[in-house]
Amino acid sequence: MKNDLTIAKIKHTDFAELYDKFIIGKKLNQKQYETLLAIAICFTNADDINVQQWGYRIVVEYCNQTQDYMPLYEIAINKGLYPVSKFIERHYIDDDQRNFFTEWNDAFTEQYISGDICRSEQQDALIKFFEKKYNNTISISAPTSYGKSELILSTIKEYKGRKICVLTSTKALLTQTKKRIQQISKGIFPKVVVHPEMYNSKDVSCLAVLTQERLLRVLKKDPALAFDCIIVDEAHEILENNARSRILADVIIVAQKRNPDVAFKFLTPFLADSKNLKIRYTTYDIEGFKVSEYIKTEKYYLYDLKNHTGLKFYDQFLNKFLPISGDENLGFEENVVKKYSAEKNIIYLNKPLDIEKFALDLAAVLPEVKSEIIQRACDNIAEYLQPQYNLITCLRKGIIYHHGSVPDAIRIYIEDLYKENEAIKYVITSSTLLSGVNLPAERMFILDNRRGRSNLSHDSFKNLVGRVCRFNEIFNNDSGTLQRLEPQIYLVF
């Protein structure tokens, strides 16, 4: 039976009024919850993909409000979202709810478990596709958390004794990537080349992690260097119209000219068509794999400081704002962040000066953190830099920040502190975060809609919000929660 529901049709029904109350958390009676759930299940079977996703969002919200996760369990099983169903089976299904079907589903999903990770249907298909194409040029388009880092590691192992390069778009991502692959590369490659001066043309094999500028210098240094494989992380950046994207295109052209059989692995969180990665003057063909699963469903909030309209919820399906605290006036951005923050928060700003200024403003309204580890960290940083360094003031209040001016050694140190210490709740960062740097967070506050000299593009915005509530945080067996299937994104202007 055809289900031709569209959002335009649904907007003009009584359902929209009930949904508005539900989505901003107003208390409903049992009959209203049952009505919402029945309609949501109907939506998940619609032909329109937007209606399907809206139905899924309603089911997730229903389950988080009522703590009845059986509807989400059944939908997750049917849609191949096995990390969701497995987490529910382990944490929310009581013994008296178990039956033949739950036991059969449990046994069925075992095939999608690898170590401590349960893969979704498309995640499993992605890995199988990648493993069959080690020697081919391919593109992988998958959201954050779909295991692109694991694909990089497996490729490095596959190219043992050969020449392989991982291209990263920023020095921050370069450092993070090097740290991740260093352990598995021992015994496979003599070293990890991260700077042109480290490269030795006499080495038979080579594992390099470089930005496009550094790779270009290495290629100029050794005209005979020919790579067997180049992994291009954050490959969508090649489509941007700027000097760095042109350098990236240049090194790809040179690499293929030197070795026509070089295998390129283009990894990106979004891509409309893999053919868009075909560069002029190259001859490679691209096979693409694109993930279309919808597991996380973001909740967007707008706090309008200029017009004093308080907090509003933005519904991306109905394209409208719903007031939550219309008479509230918190006055300044730091007060909004303080009131609506969670245990771990990412705050986005565009300029280094704005980042440091806001970090100090936020520090001024927060209490000092009582932690020996934080005190020791402040002492260590004071020895490395001048004691008046703003970062130390912020660190004492549970805040870190990083941008291009923060030394690499300090940045790595404070990132590890943020990941491992509950006392540090806030990280304030720039577009570095868009380049694949991964930090745990439950909520995001976007205080600037610009990236560099232009506005955040649609794709950059999606990439940014995708950094919140990664799968390893949602489905962690000890600390995970399905509340994180609904990451909260606050836009404060």
Give names to the regions the model predicted.
Residues 1-493:
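N-terminal helicase ATP-binding lobe
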